[in-house]
């Protein structure tokens, strides 16, 4: 198996690109470094392609290692033929490899092995090859002290044949593909669980093709099964099929081993093999495959949403008051300055409104607060209302209030990191600090929190947690390096995400900075303990030194490329300070004049872009949503209302929008636009501010159906999805006929409602 060629085909890249990327990865280079500073070597592979390459490379190398183990095992048994070796070496996935290994894999003594030891292999061979009608007569010649009668002999022969049938790799592959492509997954409510499992009512009696089941439905029904509410079964033929009727799968097995239609004993053996052995194994395998595919989709959704939140526009360096709302325990308040340094804290109470207004007004005036960040949890709307009174009562202060997600703030508050950062601050007040800081700079603050706690994932608790963690770590790393960090102000958790660095090196940088003062150049980073040349190469381009000796240190230009900039300056006859940020002078430089064997055109163009806008931030402009006054709870909503909200989560089937009622509403993919939408992310992303219309409210089930097509009328003629979306929905799943109707957005809201633990 040629790994390079396989990766080349999968990524639509040349073998030269693939080999270069593999060499860099094997040499310890990080994905952000390769994507940014080694474009010539990889032909411009981006971070997404490099992540895919790294993941597939690991899989294929594990496959090769497993092949070596399998070949050695079979060879030691003396059963490795040239043909089998060729099949094993040609296997392109782990499932196919294990199918080939199954007949030779060491296993506990089976009925077939015992029968073989008792001399029944020849009987099994005769029964299959000659297919005598009188099988009992054929068995008489194989009786011995271990086989007292014909029945025992035939039972042993059957065990041998069943194992032989079930371990035929080519046959199993055929049956597996057929089952996956044609079988339906049938979900039914467990008797007596109708009330307890009401949130799974969409799946109380549902059938749809297993291969077409969307990830959100797959994870929903699997959660229902895990909670003891749903039974799940794979159906390969109609329920009313007579039990004696031979299935297509049994016919395939019979044809494979040339079993005649009239031989009842062999036909029964085939039926038992399929129903008691092969199907049970393939059903479990299919459900695992469904789970893995659903995990992949859900993790992809979570990763994209996390990226959108991490790269949300920062409000900027403004003194901010963070409010962590609460009823009984009060509203926790924290003021941080424009650098995020804690200035003041206090706890106020909603039922003491006048005192709360006076206290917050004092804090705002005393510290020059410009922004109020309000957590969106319990008591958020009441807190927001009082903050609104403050803003209106202080027009001269240029004060603005913004409701922000407080997901993960409580987890951060109780973390070891928060304890080190604020050892003398009450745990309850640390969350208010986090809320204030995440408004100033979401990326810098959210990196301190386990990404799984940020709450932008589709069924994040149901998917494979190690795969999820690996994917999210990659997203955080890519986001931090895309923005870059100030080496003199960044926290250790933020520095730890920089290419080439880890927690230890990040702590060393902070410790060196605290002891020796601010870094005045990137070169000074080499004085940090354990930060060597290799690490410096990987990290330097992503670390900024503002106001240092070298102007380029504040840019994304890598130190290795400084000589190139020096040549540009010499050609133009100007200094770095005169060139950096001077768009007209940068435009006069011809990129091709500075290419050489080491630095190609892609790198030179990147350098020029950076010189034009040094340290440019890829994050967009800051914007906020204004929640409607008087809309606090789901019971306040009325069908037809047009509201402003914030996209909290984007899934494959639509987008969830926070409209300020403590329960996100769903805009189904069909209601995102008047045009056909293939992927919701073509229209929205997490953090976007959108206008929506309320189409349906189910307060009992906490479900809200919304549309971004503001001319839609609930239940009206306009309230239909584009024809392409209707077609896609019909092919995506099928319910029993009594439930089969043209879906509306409200029906889809029911079908795809967000399930929370």
Curated annotation (Swiss-Prot):
Keywords: RNA-binding. GO terms for molecular function: mRNA binding; structural constituent of ribosome. The keyword Transit peptide does not apply. It comes from the Bacteria. Residues 710-741 have a biased composition (Basic and acidic residues). Residues 710-757 are annotated as: Disordered. SMART domains: S1, YqgFc. Residues 640-709 form the S1 motif domain. This is Transcriptional accessory protein Tex.
